[in-house]
Regions:
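Switch/coupling sub-region of P-loop NTPases
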Residues: 198-200, 216-343, 353
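Phosphate-binding/switch region of NTP-binding enzymes
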Residues: 340-373
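P-loop NTP-binding catalytic core
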Residues: 90, 94-196
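Hydrophobic anchor at the beta1->P-loop junction of P-loop NTPases
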Residues: 202-204
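Conserved lysine of the Walker
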Residues: 210
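N-terminal accessory targeting/assembly segments
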Residues: 1-128
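NTP-binding/hydrolysis catalytic cores, primarily Walker-type P-loop NTPases
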Residues: 361-439
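Walker A (P-loop) phosphate-binding loop of P-loop NTPases
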Residues: 207
Length: 439
């Protein structure tokens, strides 16, 4: 029996495997054999390591050599939304219920952390090194990775990483109503707008529920309407419906951009937006606009297509301002021109927010109408009013209520009428419009 520590055992095992079974490290088809080789080496050497049985040691050494070290068990967890590596010795888990927990284990050293993250990024063909210290990638199974290393972060930090685990799930109106994110009336209004040709943008910060809301709205679209989705790196929109025989029931085209350091292999969201228009879509859904694809999304909407998307911004005017700034990256038309186009392209802005009690709320729905002279008129249609914030025994409690502030404008109601909204349905939302406008 040999008493040692994990890292000494790892070093010796790696040397042994590299010398006698090197191909097993690089050939995925031989990974089962690799584990057997590791097990034999461990048993032959009689390693004794505190806190590990022989089986646990074999699994950990295997994870260190071909998987992702301490991150491996968390990457497949269904109750974890994010893994944040602040530095090699500081790893924080964010659970689906909002809890943030620091892991007891951490990487062995700054270099160890960098090596594991390089392995993570390898799956999407991305490289991180001193020349390119910022990288974004993904893992199979809808996991997004953003990493930064020195010289962007301190040398003794090693590397900082945000890993977001995207869990496929069918979200519908009932889920959002039951969670308190929106009311039935709000969901019905938004579903009507998307179904009958009103482009909208869902704004908010990270983890505010933007994509969850978008999934629910698109899931309400009739199966005969064609939806074309565009996302970056990892899938967040899950819209394909199958019957019990596995047959597809609706009409969806899912696409993913392919970021690459090699320009010849790079496929941007902007290119996919342009391609979408050749697929005769009823709705184009851009998971998130964050760069020059904003201009293509605006143009697609202005040419009569229904476009729905999300953006990191504040509510109403702030969302249009953000979209206009992104459009400027493609064509410098002048901020006023880009702003006017963004407003016309997306007459509805839905603002989602994550509250301190970890609940998500549709805080505001605003409509903008651009008059012939170019003047923009904003009106709040719905909002969530917070009436009480309470912090007690380490927990936040937030109370409030949803309010219908104004009916849609006559301009929006006319668009919906022309698009075929049944009068009975439209009347639920446009009742009182003349009285409101008279005020």
């Amino acid at each position: 029996m040999t008493r040692t520590d994990l890292w000494k055992a790892l070093e010796e095992t790696q040397l042994y495997i590299s010398k006698y079974y090197a191909t097993a490290l690089t050939d995925e088809d031989k990974h089962d054999q690799l584990k057997a080789y590791i097990e034999k080496f461990v048993l032959d050497n009689g390693y004794l390591i505190d806190g590990f049985t022989d089986e646990e040691l074999v699994n950990r050494l295997y994870s260190e050599m071909v998987e992702y070290s301490i991150l491996t068990p968390y990457l497949g967890a269904s109750d974890i939304d994010e893994i944040n590596v602040n530095s090699w010795d500081d790893v924080v888990l964010t659970y689906s219920d909002g809890r943030m927990v620091k892991t007891e284990e951490h990487f062995h050293s700054p270099g160890h952390a960098v090596d594991i993250v390089k392995r993570l990024l390898h799956h999407s063909g991305m490289i991180i090194d001193n020349a390119m210290p910022i990288a974004q990638g993904h893992l199979p199974g809808n996991t997004r990775i953003t990493a930064i290393k020195s010289p962007v972060v301190d040398e003794d930090c090693g590397i900082s990483v945000s890993i977001r685990l995207l869990h496929p799930q069918r979200v519908d109106r009932k889920c959002l109503i039951d969670s308190g994110m929106a009311t039935e009336e709000i969901m019905e209004f938004l579903e009507m707008c998307v179904r009958y040709g009103v482009s909208l943008v869902v704004a908010g910060r990270t983890s505010s529920g933007k994509t969850t809301l978008l999934n629910a709205l698109l899931g309400s679209i009739p199966d005969d309407k064609r939806i074309y989705t565009i996302e970056s790196g990892a899938r967040e929109l899950f819209l394909v419906k199958r019957n019990r025989f596995g047959e597809v029931q609706n009409n969806v085209v899912h696409t993913l951009s392919r970021p690459s350091d090699n320009g010849a292999y790079n496929i941007s969201q902007e290119e996919l937006v342009v391609a979408a228009l050749r697929f005769d879509p009823d709705i184009v859904a851009v998971g998130e606009i964050r760069d020059a694809e904003a201009n293509s999304a605006v143009e697609a909407s202005l040419t009569g297509h229904t476009v729905v998307t999300t953006v990191h911004s504040g509510p109403g005017e702030a969302a249009h301002g953000r979209i206009a700034l992104l459009c400027q990256r493609r064509f410098e038309l002048g901020m006023e021109v880009s702003l006017s186009q963004a407003r016309q392209a997306f007459p509805l802005v839905v603002f989602a927010h994550k509250c301190e009690d970890n609940s998500r709320k549709v805080m505001d729905i605003s409509e903008v109408y651009v008059a012939p002279g170019g003047q923009a008129e904003y009106r709040c249609l719905y909002r969530y009013n917070i009436t009480e914030n309470e912090y007690k025994n380490g927990h936040f409690t937030i109370k409030g209520d949803f309010e219908k502030v104004n009916p849609p404008s006559g301009h929006l109601c006319t668009i919906l009428t022309r698009s075929g909204v049944p009068q009975e349905l439209l009347g639920r939302f446009c009742t009182g419009r003349k009285e409101a406008e008279a005020e």
